[in-house]
Amino acid sequence: STGCFDYRGDGEGQGIHAAVEWLGTQNWSNGHVAIYGKSYEGATAWEAAAQGSEYLKTIVPISGTTALGPLLYKNGSAEARSQVMHSNYGGSILDYDGDDLDNMCGDVLEGFLAGPMRYGLGELDPYMDKYYDERSHIDKALGTYNGSIYWVQGMQDWNVDPHQVFGGPPGTHWYQAYIDAGYEVGGMLGQWAVSYTHLRAHETLGN
């Protein structure tokens, strides 16, 4: 980690990568590391995949965000939450005391600007294209990651919507792109929202 909260940026990815490397090289480890999580935690799996560790063997993103830009802005329109989402996460580092100034590094300040600028300027914002490209982990992982993927995604999820799995830049379908690239891809997809799934084995038979 860079010590500066950069909200899904390269610094955050480096911190996750360091954890994967540590786990994969311990004497008690077989060298096979997996990451799973839901929503933002699911994004950490893609951040690790984009770093390309030899020890990361599989990821299980559960309604995990794959690319921050399309989460907040797609089809020529910005979501209302894009104005405040970065600020909400940035505010989580504040204790509202004199030490807060120590946390106001460049990445944090950039994050506070990112949402309102994308909301107000949309595709007319070339600087923020760089910001969001850095946070498109699914694009960076393709061809870099050497493990398998097991996607868990609810089709009724309005928080991390299915576009994060089946979308992509114009002409791109991420789910199919990984299959076409030779990755081992599986998934559990169904009619639920952003939540951990609780399905007993017999409930999936025949599906």
Predicted regions: what they are:
Residues 151-153:
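Short beta-strand/loop motif that positions the catalytic acidic residue
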Residues 1-18, 22-24:
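Cap/lid segment of the alpha/beta-hydrolase catalytic domain
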Residues 28-39:
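Alpha/beta-hydrolase fold nucleophile elbow
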Residues 38-47:
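Glycine-rich nucleophile elbow surrounding the catalytic serine of serine-hydrolase chemistry
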